[in-house]
Swiss-Prot record:
Family affiliation: Belongs to the scoloptoxin-07 family.
Propeptide position ranges: 20-41
Organism: Scolopendra mutilans (Chinese red-headed centipede)
Protein modification: Contains 3 disulfide bonds.
Example of a GO MF term: toxin activity
Tissue localization of expression: Expressed by the venom gland.
Protein's name according to its UniProt entry: Kappa-scoloptoxin(07)-Ssm2d
Gene Ontology cellular component list: extracellular region
Compartments, record wording: Secreted
Length: 74
């Protein structure tokens, strides 16, 4: 009886956990959102351009750049 439960557990575990991670790739929108969040976090570092420091009508560049003097908005 114990062997039966062990086999059942291994079968269910392998089908749910391993199957979910191997057979189903990460959806592209979720992956894209994660990459955008990482880029936003890079821009939020203290030495990078911050959007809230920019005057009205100016924005930080797409590529995060280090600002030595001023908010470096374009």
């Amino acid at each position: 009886m114990l062997v039966f439960y062990a086999l059942l557990f291994v079968t269910v575990f392998s089908n749910t956990v391993m199957g979910a991670t191997i057979d189903k790739p990460i959806p592209k929108p979720i992956l894209r959102e994660a990459i955008e969040e990482i880029e936003v976090n890079k821009r939020a570092d203290s030495h990078y351009c911050k959007e809230e420091n920019c005057p009205p009508g100016k924005h930080c560049p797409e590529v995060p750049i280090a600002c030595v003097y001023g908010p470096c908005c374009f």
